[in-house]
Amino acid sequence: MVNTYLMFGRYSSNALKTASAARTRKAEHIVGRFRGQIKGMYAMLGGNDLLMIVDLPGIEEAIKVYAGLTKLTGITFTSYPAISVTELDRLMQEVANI
């Protein structure tokens, strides 16, 4: 089973200074090392600077990716598990008669 995580990042000033395509490739490698796949990566304005949508096997891999990315980049991440609305609909059907 694959789990989707939304990883919101906030850059420190040093993390922003060291941003580069090479660092992005290293970040992609960290996700892959823990059997994950990046579904999307977006720069943002506002309270968060970065959004990564990542598929990972489980919470242990999500924690390892979080720690690895933070160590590599200096970016502080807040991660949330997510499910599709289709999956939510299926779950709600299972509890419809409760």
Question: Where would I find each of the regions flagged by the language model?
Answer:
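An amphipathic, aromatic/His-enriched active-site/gating alpha helix that lines ligand/cofactor pockets
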Residues: 56-86
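Short S/T/G/P-rich N-terminal loop/turn motif that feeds into the first structured element of a domain
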Residues: 1-33, 37, 45-48, 89-98
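Generic structural signal for residues in well-ordered beta-strands
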Residues: 38-41, 77-79
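Alpha-helix boundary/interfacial micro-motifs
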Residues: 20, 27, 52, 63-66, ...
